Amino acid sequence: MFGAPLLNEIIARALVLLVAFPVHEGAHAFVANWLGDPTPRRAGRISWNPLRHLDIVGAILFLYAGIGWAYTPVDPSRLGRRGMAIVSVAGPLANLLTGALFAIPAHFVLTNPSLDRLFGYGQIFPSLGDIMWFMVLYNILLGLFNLIPLPPLDGFSILVGIVPYPWAITLMKLQPYGILIMLGLVFLLPMTGINPVGWVFQAARLLSLRLVAGL
């Protein structure tokens, strides 16, 4: 997953980036605005325009490693714990739905070699099948990965929103350490033989295969 990607894979990820991240962050923004928080609207995030959502460092990391980030500003004081949980779950659900929808054209392209070769082929330019497959895989991966209940992922905000208030207060003490937790999750834990990110990736791959093959 973290090996040096081929050029065709980078190009395919770039195309995915223009879809998966705006879908995810746009869903957060739309739901937050719907629940009464004008912060995303004032920041110009009520949009599917990729340029309004992408973070340059997160985008570059996604192109190289398949994991990146973007950000939608919201005001927790306007949303409350329950509202934050609803806003948080919107992003992953939007990605899972997008991945499932892309599985339909992916199935037809990957089962028809003539369609697969319409766009490009080889190690330089991705084939149409490559693009469709990555659209499914990385939307599913982004959806599942963000459901991990650790800060700063969406799953953590969902967890904080559904547990009893005293538990939520205790959990929220972890928020300042979100970056350190992510570094440990992605880079340190795998050195011990425990690789949650790898498990999520394998689950995403299996689910994507079933979606594409099962149509």
Report residues per predicted region:
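Hydrophobic transmembrane alpha-helices and their immediate loop junctions
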Residues: M1-L215
